[in-house]
Swiss-Prot record:
Its main location: virion. It comes from the Viruses. Plays a role in the inhibition of host innate immune response by disrupting the interaction between NMI and STAT1. In turn, NMI-mediated transcription of interferon-gamma stimulated genes is inhibited. Keywords: Host cytoplasm, Host-virus interaction, Inhibition of host innate immune response by virus, Inhibition of host interferon signaling pathway by virus, Inhibition of host STAT1 by virus, Interferon antiviral system evasion, Viral immunoevasion, Virion, Virion tegument. It holds the Pfam family US22. The gene is UL23. One of its GO terms (cellular component) is viral tegument. The keyword Transport does not apply. This is Tegument protein UL23. It is found in: Virion tegument; Host cytoplasm.
Length: 284
């Protein structure tokens, strides 16, 4: 493992590798531990960047604890490489000055930087398991109702699913329990407030989290994102229904995603990888 680390750091002009090691070359593919269908392509990117230094500085500003970043390579599916690209821009891997690894991802509504590992060694051991928005079909629950929910491709399909399963209890992948609602339980003004707060053209209620401590409503917007709302706040829970089914409310407890746009940052509650309670500074 130490030889691999030396090669990795040599790629980033940190150290000179020992003579017995073979440094990774630009364009070389490094298979990921998870997910198995993707690899790291060293020093290759599929988006236009005019100034690499300024772009890395811009991405670092997304973090709650900014640090200098260095571009490592792109995360590509083997299918993407086989067909020589598609309309989706591959995610990019960055190395922080602290040794932490981050993943840049381009979403429909914003880009983001996600904390993926504390070190190069951890990244090589776990891959992208800390990226909650990355899901694989094998993680889907076996219940037909949740598989049908994950398969909804647009907001109208979701509304039909809700009508089919209204009133039922659903156990998500993190074992959180959701009660599916009907739209009649909500005032038009409440739904419109949600729509304005998340900046979407259309939102639909999903239900509420079964909890003895607070009333937490859940709704879906026309980008198929899932949000949680109480009397005071709205925050994003999942970037897709697939993520919501497999991860449930995980982002409320462990969230390493940092969005780039101001509107999404207001709707996101990240967990500092260094254990700093930034909420204390925000309230000061």
């Amino acid at each position: 493992m130490s030889v691999i680390k030396d090669c990795f750091l040599n790629l980033l002009d940190r150290w000179r590798p020992p003579k017995t090691s073979r440094p990774w070359k630009p364009g070389q593919r490094v298979a990921l531990v998870w997910p198995k269908d993707r690899c790291l392509v060293i020093r290759r990117r599929w988006r236009l960047v005019r100034d690499e230094g300024r772009d890395a500085q811009r991405l670092a500003s997304y973090l709650c604890c900014p640090e200098p970043l260095r571009f490592v390579g792109s995360i590509c599916t083997y299918n993407f490489l086989k067909h020589k690209g598609d309309h989706n821009v591959p995610s990019e891997l960055y190395l922080g000055a602290s040794g932490a690894m981050y993943l840049w991802t381009d979403h429909i509504y914003s880009d983001s930087l996600t904390f993926v590992a504390e070190s190069i060694t951890e990244f090589l051991n776990i891959g992208l398991r800390r990226c909650n928005f990355i899901t694989v079909p094998e993680e889907l629950p076996h219940t037909a109702s949740l598989r049908a929910l994950a398969g909804c491709m647009h907001i109208h399909a979701f509304a039909q699913w809700r009508a089919t399963y209204r009133g039922r209890l659903m156990v998500m992948g993190d074992y959180s329990v959701i009660r599916v609602s009907t739209i009649r339980l909500y005032d038009w003004s409440e739904i419109n407030d949600w729509r304005v707060m998340v900046g979407s053209n259309h939102v639909e209620p999903l239900g509420w989290l079964v909890s003895p401590y607070d009333v937490i409503n859940l709704f879906v917007d026309d980008c198929m994102r899932v949000f949680a709302a109480n009397n005071q706040h709205v925050c994003i829970v999942a970037d897709s229904l697939m993520e919501f089914v497999t991860r449930g409310m995980t982002r409320c407890h462990e969230n390493g995603i940092y969005y780039g746009t101001r509107s999404m940052r207001k709707l996101n509650k990240p967990t500092c990888p260094y254990g700093v309670d930034h909420q204390l500074f925000d309230d000061a």
